[in-house]
Amino acid sequence: STGDLLRDAVAKSTELGLRAKAAMDSGKLVDDATVLGMIRERLRLPDASRGFILDGFPRNIAQAEALQKLLGELRTPLESVVLLNVDLGILFKRLTGRRICQDCGKVFNVHTAPPPEGKHRLIQRPDDKEEVIGKRLEVYEAQTKPLIKYYEAAGLLRIVDADADVDTVFKSIEHAVFKHEIKHEIKH
């Protein structure tokens, strides 16, 4: 995810990581140029030549346009964009139930995939709390949802019904990416 790229760059104190840290420490969002710089660096690594997945980026039309420009510079075509289409009630339950082990970093869900008793020290991420989720959904509606039409017009959008269990959703994503045949109505 782009969040992982940010955290890694900050931990390694790269030039871009230091810029990101300065923004985060002052309570600001990391600017698009810094995030795109991190994506550029990551996509230049040899393993990315076999393909890549961007999770959580782009989040708005301006970022999508900048990403398209970057991919053009790298001569790497964008082949598909997957929308995980999930009922808001299910989404809310998944997010509020998500917990991370403080020791190993493994992700659990207290509702759907709880950890073995007493084996993990779990924490809830601040952005998985109810009040923050509401704000994140407002931002999604205002900024991210317009990307649906943007990528649909480009013929790149693949919609996956993500209400099912993890294994079923994973298989649907594989099918959408490799077969380009899954289409559903958007739920929100």
Per-segment meaning from a language model:
Residues 1-76, 87-93, 100-103, 132:
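ATP-dependent small-molecule kinase phosphotransfer cores
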Residues 4, 35-36, 83, 113, ...:
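Proline- and acidic/polar-enriched loop/turn elements at helix boundaries
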Residues 41, 97, 172-175:
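Residues within well-ordered alpha-helical secondary structure of globular protein domains
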Residues 55, 83-85, 161:
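Conserved beta-strand segments of the P-loop GTPase G domain that flank and frequently precede/overlap
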